[in-house]
């Protein structure tokens, strides 16, 4: 309802604002409400510089404040980690993991193509994609089906997994792939860093600013470059150590205490 009180809206990413045809009616209704709030002078809290840049294009007169989100809690060595049942036959083969709902922006079909190229040079390497079904599930399955039978057997689409499963995947993977076409922040990047996991990421969205130097960044539309990066991250031990060290440092840059204090400062500024 209309109010003269100061208002703050938080925007984590702009995918739904930019791609309404790929969103549900509920999501699009929420985006209409968000637009109204911003157009009636609500202050916008953006979770990254990338998100803020897009918002400035959409809402040139809006006041936008950039406040990063915090890092996920580190999983302790004693925390429960369970192998997903769907991977029981994979044995101890090395694998690259990608975690997230199967949405178009996750770019999973190209990841499968790139993996197939990289896997020709790494005979036992596997790819595990863990995430709920989404608007790109059919194209992802088509990408897997287009591979040779032997190569397709090395791609594991395991669907939604439990938190214990995620802990196991991060602990056991050789690397994480995050070739998204857009991300407003990217919690999986920080989760991978907390697990000391090397990352292959995309040059788009917030991925460069959140990952810092803890990831190999490539054009997500360039399948060959993505394949080369996947190969390098699993075969080059010196590179892996460099990425792991950078990740440990980068992870320390994010904390919920810092996020909370910056939000409190923003709220105080608005009411005073």
State each model region's role.
Residues 1-272:
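Carbohydrate transferase catalytic cores enriched for Leloir-type hexosyltransferases
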